[in-house]
Amino acid sequence: MSRMAEQQLYIHGGYTSATSGRTFETINPANGNVLATVQAAGREDVDRAVKSAQQGQKIWAAMTAMERSRILRRAVDILRERNDELAKLETLDTGKAYSETSTVDIVTGADVLEYYAGLIPALEGCQIPLRETSFVYTRREPLGVVAGIGAWNYPIQIALWKSAPALAAGNAMIFKPSEVTPLTALKLAEIYSEAGLPDGVFNVLPGVGAETGQYLTDHPGIAKVSFTGGVASGKKVMANSAASSLKEVTMELGGKSPLIVFDDADLDLAADIAMMANFFSSGQVCTNGTRVFVPTKCKAAFEQKVLARVERIRAGDVFDPQTNFGPLVSFPHRDNVLRYIAKGIEEGARVLCGGDVLKGDSFDNGAWVAPTVFTDCSDDMTIVREEIFGPVMSILTYESEDEVIRRANDTDYGLAAGIVTADLNRAHRVIHQLEAGICWINTWGESPAEMPVGGYKHSGIGRENGVMTLQSYTQVKSIQVEMAKFQSIF
């Protein structure tokens, strides 16, 4: 693909130049080619985006629930009509295989938007009787202008996960995509405008997170920030949001999730789940089950089944429909993953496969890392303690149920967890003891629109998707009505 035109900001229904004069480049990680130069939003751009959003939000909130629902449903239709085009752009920007982006990223994002479009008319208050002459009723009102700050691994899906409930509740959103993968969020803004969203209700500000993101979290005109990213960045966003104007926050942060295989499990099923929990999207998924616990007596058989499946991974041309494994999102991220792999070797973990970059004409110019499986791991190893966010699986052994539950919970993270077992009683007994917000039994990774997702501990605050997320983009107003004569004590 030839280099794209310089990308601008999207404010008040159209593209506009950044006042900062600063730019950055986004690359195709499969081959290192520059895709586009992108303008970076500065403080003045954030100010005008907020003013635009405030104007648009008043118009949007004044519409009836059905009017808002129809506009968002039109956006869903456009997303599905343009699925292949958007998936190709997402593949170029992220490096993910087209077989994945065309069937997951836009599809699941559109599903979430459709879900919330349908919920808009059901957003309602309640009536509380006090006595015969008095009652209270409540209204759920929009927060106003909210900000979404996205991560680089699922750019358009995250933009939809954040904007769908916010817009459904009557808010306007200013969205800052990751500077690593900024392109499809701008296309989403076009689609919202085409669907009939009032100008200013969805503005997109590409920029460097440490600057543009901070301007958003500092701004007094923003009522809430929804952030997806790493724990350290999330803590800064939360601190800035509280210090500036006591903003509400949703934090979807990192994970180091356990996948527990029990001795009664079908090992073929367990190996299939472990593969998806570690190598889907080249391991760049926050919910990955990177700590794979297996009974000592099952270790050798499990390892062989995993190795057989790793051999079936198809890396290469990301637009080949048979390819199911792409490069990492950037060269700095590739280098960071390689440092973790080197640390694992240094600390005594044994490499079953991988452990280096992929080599060959198809890979030499891209950010490729081979699918890597470590075994003979211990809980104190760096690769077991810290989030790597790459195609790196760590296999650990255990002897008893109580032991594995204790070790699975021995982490600052609490995003996801899963178990594989044929025993239904054990499945529920163990899952109820795991300290994680998203749990799976005999499966892994699905996050449908109806399912609230979010973490315990350092993995986050609040939830995305589900009914409760729509409510989190509203504030409750309580009104008492008195029909009897008011009695004053004065």
UniProtKB/Swiss-Prot annotation:
NCBIfam families (alphabetical): BADH, PRK13252.1
Record-annotated site: Seems to be a necessary countercharge to the potassium cations: 248
Active site location: 162 (charge relay system), 252 (proton acceptor), 286 (nucleophile), 464 (charge relay system)
Metal-binding keyword on record: yes
Pathway note: Amine and polyamine biosynthesis; betaine biosynthesis via choline pathway; betaine from betaine aldehyde: step 1/1
EC number(s) on file: 1.2.1.8
InterPro entries (UniProt xref): Ald_DH/histidinol_DH (IPR016161), Ald_DH_C (IPR016163), Ald_DH_CS_CYS (IPR016160), Ald_DH_CS_GLU (IPR029510), Ald_DH_N (IPR016162), Aldehyde_DH_dom (IPR015590), BADH (IPR011264)
Similarity remark: Belongs to the aldehyde dehydrogenase family.
GO biological process, one term: glycine betaine biosynthetic process from choline
The keyword Glycosyltransferase is annotated on this UniProt entry: no
SUPFAM superfamilies listed in its UniProt record: ALDH-like
Organism for this UniProt entry: Escherichia coli O127:H6 (strain E2348/69 / EPEC)
Gene: betB
Residues bound to NAD(+): 150-152, 176-179, 230-233, 254, 286, 387
Protein role: Involved in the biosynthesis of the osmoprotectant glycine betaine. Catalyzes the irreversible oxidation of betaine aldehyde to the corresponding acid.
MF GO annotations: betaine-aldehyde dehydrogenase (NAD+) activity; metal ion binding
Family matches, as Gene3D superfamilies: Aldehyde Dehydrogenase, Chain A, domain 1, Aldehyde Dehydrogenase, Chain A, domain 2
Protein name: Betaine aldehyde dehydrogenase
CC cofactor note: Binds 2 potassium ions per subunit.
